[in-house]
């Protein structure tokens, strides 16, 4: 049976004008506007409570030294320990600082061994930084040579 193209085009035009069904618009899903991890935090607190930690009182500040030379500094931190699990917990909002920035305020609170260790760590970081700077200079020189040739 032959199909008349004019009638078919006319039917397509009419069917486009008379759509059946509702509009299929997307419903905008709003994400969590306040990204708080209270659910995860309560689970974590429940698990930590099972360890029966002891709270250490009167801790004014705590510092956590990283290998990359950064220091996590906690003001008015809550420190808990669970000696049976060899676990120490520090609760609070940390600020990430450099070792050189905290060194003057921390130096008076440290013993001789810790002071020597931090001094050595600071010197190692400075040496690494100078080596990285030298490598960066060499790389920029080679890039310029390649571009010039």
Curated annotation (Swiss-Prot):
<keyword id="KW-0963">Cytoplasm</keyword>
<dbReference type="GO" id="GO:0015031">
    <property type="term" value="P:protein transport"/>
</dbReference>
<dbReference type="InterPro" id="IPR039370">
    <property type="entry name" value="BTF3"/>
</dbReference>
<comment type="similarity">
    <text>Belongs to the NAC-beta family.</text>
</comment>
<keyword id="KW-0805">Transcription regulation</keyword>
<dbReference type="GO" id="GO:0051082">
    <property type="term" value="F:unfolded protein binding"/>
</dbReference>
<dbReference type="GO" id="GO:0006613">
    <property type="term" value="P:cotranslational protein targeting to membrane"/>
</dbReference>
<protein>
    <recommendedName>
        <fullName>Nascent polypeptide-associated complex subunit beta-2</fullName>
    </recommendedName>
</protein>
<dbReference type="InterPro" id="IPR002715">
    <property type="entry name" value="Nas_poly-pep-assoc_cplx_dom"/>
</dbReference>
<dbReference type="InterPro" id="IPR038187">
    <property type="entry name" value="NAC_A/B_dom_sf"/>
</dbReference>
<comment type="function">
    <text>Acts as a component of the nascent polypeptide-associated complex (NAC), which promotes mitochondrial protein import by enhancing productive ribosome interactions with the outer mitochondrial membrane. Also blocks the inappropriate interaction of ribosomes translating non-secretory nascent polypeptides with translocation sites in the membrane of the endoplasmic reticulum. BTT1 may act as a transcription factor that exert a negative effect on the expression of several genes that are transcribed by RNA polymerase II.</text>
</comment>
<dbReference type="GO" id="GO:0005854">
    <property type="term" value="C:nascent polypeptide-associated complex"/>
</dbReference>
<keyword id="KW-0804">Transcription</keyword>
<comment type="subunit">
    <text>Part of the nascent polypeptide-associated complex (NAC), consisting of EGD2 and either EGD1 or BTT1. NAC associates with ribosomes via EGD1 or BTT1.</text>
</comment>
<dbReference type="GO" id="GO:0005634">
    <property type="term" value="C:nucleus"/>
</dbReference>
<keyword id="KW-0653">Protein transport</keyword>
<dbReference type="GO" id="GO:0030015">
    <property type="term" value="C:CCR4-NOT core complex"/>
</dbReference>
<dbReference type="GO" id="GO:0051083">
    <property type="term" value="P:'de novo' cotranslational protein folding"/>
</dbReference>
<dbReference type="Pfam" id="PF01849">
    <property type="entry name" value="NAC"/>
</dbReference>
<keyword id="KW-0813">Transport</keyword>
<dbReference type="GO" id="GO:0005829">
    <property type="term" value="C:cytosol"/>
</dbReference>
<feature type="domain" description="NAC-A/B">
    <location>
        <begin position="38"/>
        <end position="103"/>
    </location>
</feature>
<keyword id="KW-0539">Nucleus</keyword>
